[in-house]
């Protein structure tokens, strides 16, 4: 289990100067050729997403203005807050900010031939499935994960095991991404 606080994470500026990324975790850890990766991006200007052949990307707008995603003849999609949207990461996708507002989004990328991610918003206590990786990011409220208290802009990632996230207040939201391994693959094979 790895814990993080977005306010304390290192920031990598994009080459095109249109935004920045805070990498949460990759699996396998510290590998450039990852099977899955979670990150948070701040987007300050219109531009294209980086290409990642053989990967699927799920983007969830966390804050800021809506974002229009365009991919040639494939789709035009308005990304709205807390509504995950998946697309192939090997296609050119342009992001256009609405009303010139900076946006922040959560990204999970998975290698299509190895694993698949599912992203959802939780508003109550829940337990994750065993033997699956995952990431949680607190949008608001206070959540208990084991002996750790997680609050706004904090989270955790893990590579396997069952974990209970307990909401400690009447209301709260967190983003939860679960990694499912495809048949013939498991985290044990690559660690």
Swiss-Prot record:
It comes from the Bacteria. Disulfide bonds: none annotated. SUPFAM superfamilies: RmlC-like cupins (SSF51182). InterPro entries: RmlC-like_jellyroll (IPR014710), RmlC_Cupin_sf (IPR011051), Uncharacterised_HutD/Ves (IPR010282), Uncharacterised_Ves (IPR023482). Pfam families: HutD (PF05962). Belongs to the Ves family. This is Protein Ves. It comes from Escherichia coli O8 (strain IAI1).
């Amino acid at each position: 289990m790895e814990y993080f606080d977005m306010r304390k994470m290192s920031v990598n500026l994009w080459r095109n100067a249109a935004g920045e990324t805070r990498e949460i975790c990759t699996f396998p850890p510290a590998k450039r050729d990852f099977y899955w990766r979670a990150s948070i991006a701040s987007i300050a200007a219109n531009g294209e997403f980086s290409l990642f052949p053989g990967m699927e990307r799920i983007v969830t707008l966390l804050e800021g203005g809506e974002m229009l995603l365009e991919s040639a003849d494939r789709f035009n999609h308005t990304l709205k807050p807390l509504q995950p949207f998946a697309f192939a990461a090997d296609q050119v996708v342009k992001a256009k900010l609405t009303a010139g507002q900076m946006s922040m989004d959560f990204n999970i990328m998975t290698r299509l031939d190895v694993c698949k991610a599912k992203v959802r918003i939780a508003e109550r206590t829940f337990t994750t499935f065993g033997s699956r990786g995952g990431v949680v990011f607190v949008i608001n409220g206070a959540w208990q994960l084991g002996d750790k208290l997680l609050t706004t802009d904090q989270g955790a990632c893990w590579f396997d095991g069952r974990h209970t996230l307990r909401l400690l207040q009447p209301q709260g939201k967190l983003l939860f991404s679960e990694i499912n391994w495809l048949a013939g693959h498991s985290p044990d094979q690559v660690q």
